[in-house]
Amino acid sequence: MLVLFFGTGLKAQLPSPSYPPRLVNDYTGTLSASQISTLERKLVAYNGSTSTQILVLLVDDLQGYSVEQYATEIGHSWGVGQKGKNNGAVILVKPKKGSERGQVNISPGYGMEEYVTDATAKRIIEKEMIPSFKENDYYTGINNAVNVIMDLCSGKFSQDEYADGDGFPLWLIILFIIAIMVVFSKFSGGGQNYSGGGTRTIWIPMGGGFGGGGFGGGGHSGGFGGFGGGGFGGGGASGSW
């Protein structure tokens, strides 16, 4: 009974969704108002076009939970994502304060785990987030992670491609292949001269490397309508610095 009561007390200390509900909830004062607004617009627009909900939460105190438990409990109790689809994700950040280490967790809902596996979540944390957090730039780290998660879910690149993303960007590889094809076609043209016949223009997508695009959301109007009842199973990854 004592253990049950204590566990219930812990859960009672978790924050409730704000009203009106928001996808960016900074209880630490770390992000500026403009940074919160920019992230919120992006996440609301993405939710509006895909129904996928990515919650960003910053807290100073984990209330006795591990960072993994805290993120999973928030995702489940707030109902991040849509019921039946379970297409939600929680990005939880406990900023570094004084001698206390900073902690971060990415927890995908059941329906997101095929796009953001535990290994991919760990890579996002180590590659996109912690380097910026160490420079006290929380906005860039969070924004980079959001962009990568959106791009993975939209199929802009696969998890394997993201894992190999430390090499050449995909668009540069495509450009290189096209250049080789153009040169090869000219030298195998059966003695045709290179003058006349017009000039073809080849359009190359200049999307840049992973995580740079994301979802703009500038054309979306209206606010966030609320969470949809998604479920979480405890997957994801954590990191600290």
Predicted regions and their residues:
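Folded, non-transmembrane soluble domains that reside on the lumenal/extracytoplasmic side of membranes
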Residues: 13-166
